């Protein structure tokens, strides 16, 4: 795996690898759900914003965590791959940072700037990696904001090197408050047993908009009578934590991440308890559809996830579904879409 820097690859090389490649692709009522997932139903909505899309070219970026990942995702994924995965869907995407090596934060930002400026892919905005507790966080934000595509920051909180309570340290809170001042969001991706920290974080930073990733990293197996493997938490502890978080008006929830822990043969009914609890708890104005592609491939294809979510939400009001599939992402992230 090569670790490039801005000094040894050109804009043209990057766009050839990512943006130009995309053109080649062109040659609450879960009881009544069907248990199979069909391949290509109609799109669930006339406009879809995927609020959580990953892209990584391992010739450009070093992702330490990917070295021990499942072979399904331990490879490069380009805009062309995403276009193929979303064929037939009226979808645009918000890039989500991919936990690159520490010395590549600015490089990732530059690559995304060039990709988005090319206007040749479905990706039109970005949530970038950042270190809120870093002394140079303000300068980093200025550099990223100058690129014009930044909507928010994420700093992974569930990696083994990050101790519990990191997001509540004084310097971290200072950085999060700065995001609020600059009208930028913070995506929270945290261990499910530490969700109560999100309540404190949101309380301490009331002027910052938070987006909780992946239904709080819920493990859908917790709701199965006989799961194939032990879930990461109990159903009740996750439910109570999510209810506490939802009381904070400055936290929204991404509806995603529920397919990944599932074993082969899952059905929409298996996912419905987690999805419906989030939709009901956060309300129709604070939920966002997200794919988590390509990480979702650990449990199913992007289209399978879209189809399942469409079935789970089919009985909800059309206005609520419009908010889920696109409108909320546009408003919460301040998107030009």
Regions found by a protein language model. Name each.
Residues 52, 93, 126, 179, ...:
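Conserved, mostly hydrophobic/aromatic
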Residues 2-4, 8-51, 60-84, 88, ...:
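Mid-to-C-terminal alpha-helical segments outside catalytic/metal-binding sites
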Residues 76-82, 137-139, 196, 235-242:
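Alpha-helical scaffolding within the catalytic cores
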Residues 57-92, 146-163, 208-209, 216-221, ...:
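Active-site gating loops and adjacent loop-to-helix segments of metal-dependent hydrolytic enzymes
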Residues 103-119, 208-212, 270-280, 305-312:
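Short, electropositive alpha-helical surface patch
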Residues 165-288:
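Catalytic pocket-lining loop regions of alpha/beta-barrel enzymes
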Residues 103-194, 200, 216, 232-233, ...:
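Active-site gating/metal-coordination segments in enzymes
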Residues 49-51, 96, 127, 154, ...:
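Active-site neighborhood of phospho(di)ester-bond hydrolases with catalytic His/Asp-centered motifs
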């Amino acid at each position: 795996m090569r670790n490039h820097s801005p000094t040894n690859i050109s804009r043209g090389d990057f766009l050839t690898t990512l943006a130009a490649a995309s053109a080649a692709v062109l040659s609450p009522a879960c009881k009544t759900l069907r248990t199979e997932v069909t391949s290509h139903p109609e799109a669930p909505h006339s406009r879809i914003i995927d609020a959580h899309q990953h892209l990584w070219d391992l010739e450009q970026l070093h992702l330490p965590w990917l070295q021990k990942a499942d072979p399904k995702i331990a490879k490069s994924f380009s805009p062309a791959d995403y276009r193929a995965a979303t064929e037939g869907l009226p979808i645009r995407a918000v890039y989500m940072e991919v936990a690159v090596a520490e010395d590549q934060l600015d490089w990732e930002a530059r690559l995304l700037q060039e990709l988005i400026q090319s206007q040749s892919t479905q990706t039109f905005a970005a949530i970038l990696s950042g270190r809120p507790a870093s002394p140079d966080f303000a300068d980093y934000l200025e550099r990223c904001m100058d690129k014009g595509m930044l909507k928010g920051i994420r700093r992974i909180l569930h990696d083994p090197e990050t101790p519990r309570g990191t997001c509540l340290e004084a310097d971290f809170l200072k950085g999060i408050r700065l995001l609020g001042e600059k009208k930028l969001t913070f995506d929270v991706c945290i261990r499910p047993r530490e969700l109560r920290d999100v309540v404190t974080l949101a309380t301490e930073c009331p002027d910052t908009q938070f987006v909780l990733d992946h239904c709080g990293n819920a493990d859908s197996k917790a709701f199965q009578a006989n799961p194939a493997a032990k879930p990461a938490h109990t159903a009740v502890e996750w439910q109570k934590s999510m209810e506490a978080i939802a009381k904070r008006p400055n936290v929204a929830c991404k509806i995603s991440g529920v397919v990944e822990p599932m074993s082969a043969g899952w059905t929409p009914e298996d996912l419905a308890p987690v999805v419906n609890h989030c939709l009901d708890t956060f309300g129709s104005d604070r939920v966002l559809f997200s794919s988590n592609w390509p990480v979702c491939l650990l449990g199913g294809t992007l289209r399978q996830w879209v189809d399942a979510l469409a079935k789970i939400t089919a009985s909800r009001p059309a206005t609520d579904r419009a908010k889920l599939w696109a409108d909320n992402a546009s408003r919460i992230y301040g998107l030009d879409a």
